[in-house]
Swiss-Prot record:
Protein's UniProt name: Small ribosomal subunit protein bS16
Organism field: Heliobacterium modesticaldum (strain ATCC 51547 / Ice1)
Keyword Flavoprotein attributed: no
GO molecular function annotations of the record: structural constituent of ribosome
UniProt record similarity statement: Belongs to the bacterial ribosomal protein bS16 family.
Domain of life: Bacteria
Amino acid sequence: MATRIRLKRLGMKKAPFYRVVVADSRSPRDGRFIEEIGYYNPTKEPAILQIDEEKAIKWLSSGAQPSDTVKALLNKAGILDKMAEKKAQA
């Protein structure tokens, strides 16, 4: 099963709120997901980003591919840097 880490859109019209989820790559954007690992609210000033670091690293190390947007968010949160350090130590 190919898994992706991506955003699930919630909220109202013109006021989006996203959950960062791990889902099967074949499931629809707002459909079924395996696990929720965080949330992102771009409407607040500054934008709120909360990601469970342990869960994200677990899924990335097991082969889950982040979408382009989630990759940028993980980079902003510093999780990809910690993942690279972990690989370098191994």
